[in-house]
Amino acid sequence: MAQITINIQTLDWTMGETVGLHLMLKKDSKARIAWGDGKVQVVTGKQKPASEKLAWVEAGHSYPEKGMYYTITICSEEEDAIIGFDGCGMFEVKTFDVILTECPNLRILGYSGYGEEKLDVSKNPLLEFID
C-alpha cells in the first residue's frame, strides 16, 4: 500500500476552506482520498491523449468549517501506483505536514503552495523531480 498524509487547518478568510491537489498515478490505478471530514474521493490514473505519458489527475474539496484541523489521507492498495504528488492548491489552508514516508515509489513532487514545513524524502529513493 502507498500512502501520503497531509495535516491542515482551514483558514478564517474568504478562500480558507478549499484544497486542491494533483496526483499522477499508474494508468488505471486507483487512489482514495479521505479528506478528513468524512468525505472520500476516488481518482483513477490515466494517460495523456495520443501519448504514452501519464497525465495529472485533479482532485479538490471544500471544507464545511473555517479554523478546523483535518488530516487528508491519500492511499492506494498498489504500492507503486502513486507516481507524482503536487499540492498546488494547498496555499488556501495552513499545511502542517506532508508525510511521504509511506510512498516509496514517488517520483515527482510539487512542493510549492505548502507552508514552511520540512519534507522528509529519505524514504523516497526514486524521487526524480522536486518543483
Identify what each model region corresponds to:
Residues 128-131:
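Solenoidal tandem-repeat scaffolds enriched in leucines and small polar residues
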